[in-house]
């Protein structure tokens, strides 16, 4: 049966019964977002509600973020008791909780904002939150969903129970999380600035339309994986990209969250590969291109704030940390994604593939899937997509990049990480991912 994975209301009834205030973290977001934004201008409200969220993007400090556990050598430890797994889980859900707090604060200060300012502020926060959910879904598979207070009230009638009480949240299937993330990104896209986040100015380093288009392309490229909920059985029976349908908005359309419907001339149904190609083309239309300076090949870069402090454990003195760009989203990745999607959709990805090779000083060659994977492993070595690529290509469990001791310990269950044991102990509604139960 063909599935329409971008239509929010086909998902909401089955999904919302699982939504409750999550147990995933025991820090209150107010600890990170000081004050309530009750005084000052729109600029000051932005500084209180949105600017702090970018501190969580990248996770470059040791033991924080998701970059460390994305490395293949980290697979040597897959125990639910692994401290890094818990730190990454906590990091992601702390950021999600902060986003929800920010949304509540923006709602509280609506009188100080124009309608456009409110829509733009909330869109930026929801885009950051969607990115965090994307990372959590990719790592842990079945995860809980947290919403802001206002969103919870909207969904409460559909769920038949309160989603803002103190009950701890259960998990949702990975396919449901994909529905949610894709819909969120589609809805916020028209309200974000069209400029590149690398351009100097007020949007420098922030989430803009090119960043969201990149994420939508990435979600579509991996839809075969994310739509298959029984990964412990391997991926031979996973759905086919040609059979997964996305309702793609070719213009702004109306927001489904408010009950609107995009008109027929503003949307069309595409399969997963066509959807990936569509959003890659959007990035080209927005002026993205390969540049001589690698820094300009990014849709966005995560920056360590210049005034960030680093604790030296030897002398307990804080030292300034220099700003360091991390190139998470690069246009070379966009071209390789498009080439792969075209090949998987029985098309010809040679033009895009060889643009990347020419930029790297390499001769042209056939754009086979094997060649594309090989070049992704080399050209995107600094990104966190290597593990994801191997899973998508069906090479993860037999990768030559893994040590034999790691290979022998991996099973189909290893495609996602275990739910951290400390999170399971805190929230009795969480269930361990299949294959890891014996390790608890």
List each language-model region with its residue ranges.
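Membrane-proximal, proline-rich intrinsically disordered regions
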Residues: 24-61, 292-296, 420-440
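Short coil/turn linking the two alpha-helices of tandem helical-hairpin repeats
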Residues: 137-139, 144, 196, 219-231, ...
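Flexible, polar/acidic helix-loop-strand segments at domain edges
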Residues: 286, 294-330, 439
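Extended amphipathic alpha-helical segments enriched in small hydrophobics
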Residues: 130, 217-218, 323-359
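Short, surface-exposed recognition loops and adjoining beta-strand edges that mediate ligand/DNA contacts
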Residues: 36, 60-64, 148-151, 155-156, ...
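Bacterial Sec-dependent N-terminal signal peptides
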Residues: 1-33
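Conserved, well-structured interaction surfaces
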Residues: 68-140, 164-204, 313-326, 331, ...
